Amino acid sequence: MALKDLVQDVHTKAENQPFAKLLMSGDINPTQYATYLFNQEEAYRALEAQADKHGILNDIPEIRRADKIKEDFKACRFMRVMRPEKDHVRVLPSVRRYYNYVNEGLTEKQCWAHIYVRHFGDMYGGNMISKRIKFMKHQMYAFDRKKELIEHVRSKLSDDMV
């Protein structure tokens, strides 16, 4: 059975979470989206730092998302959708738990599994999200060499990663 099929139940559960539905609806407001971006950057920075410890992104640097997410977050602030003195963005508890978990150390195999879920989720789902959220451009969902990235990451996956 393919890894995609093995994680389908978890994927379906994630898609049915209230925030995921809000994100996909296009009804998310800019402040909510900025909070989302801020938290995504935290998660991606942690994961990409662990991946760097294993050197696994050296051949595919364009898969990195943290800096692109940061640029999107800055764009939200530039649009004045957030007022720094009033709109304090915070790391959500679930993201803090993920950050702590990742920073405890991931094996190379675990890094690939997390990259598959996070980066591919944004690669595929991001196309739909960016069409629905029209108040800004979305750097985080723009992947160069998409076909090559997909092939490279898939070559590192195995069914025992579930």
Where are these regions (language model features)?
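Metal- and O2-centered redox machinery and metal/ROS homeostasis
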Residues: 1-162
